[in-house]
């Protein structure tokens, strides 16, 4: 049975990926299934969602030697030239959703309601030892 490590600690995301991969015969593990010492600190310092997903996937593959699926996602607000973008989770500091929403609303002050458009972007990367990444 092929195995895949999903680079997430989010139980909801883990359920979603299991629903996709398990019916196709994959054994799915997530970061929740690993010992804490198996999960390296990962600095997602890329300049794009895809680059951050690749950084995360490679870091985990190098430690676990497993096939890894990683994603990076965020909110891209058109009136803010795509911000918060790759900085969505830490837009106002360290993973503070309330502060992030407050900062976003402050940044949108004066922007008419019909110009407050946005999209949620996700980039997914799969890496396998000795193979080129799939982006």
Give a label for each model feature.
Residues 2-5, 11-31, 35-135:
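Anionic-ligand binding patches
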């Amino acid at each position: 049975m092929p195995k895949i490590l999903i680079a997430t600690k989010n139980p909801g995301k883990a359920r979603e990926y299991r629903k996709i991969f398990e019916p196709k015969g994959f054994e799915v593990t997530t970061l929740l299934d690993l010992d804490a010492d198996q999960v390296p600190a990962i600095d997602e310092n890329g300049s794009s969602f895809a680059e951050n997903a690749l950084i995360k996937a490679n870091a985990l593959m190098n430690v676990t030697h497993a096939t890894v699926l990683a994603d990076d996602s965020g909110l891209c607000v058109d009136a803010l030239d795509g911000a918060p973008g790759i900085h969505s989770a830490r837009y106002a500091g360290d993973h503070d959703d309330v502060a992030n929403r407050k900062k976003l609303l402050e940044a949108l002050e004066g922007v008419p309601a019909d110009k407050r458009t946005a999209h949620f972007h996700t980039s997914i990367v799969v890496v396998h030892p000795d193979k080129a990444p799939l982006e």
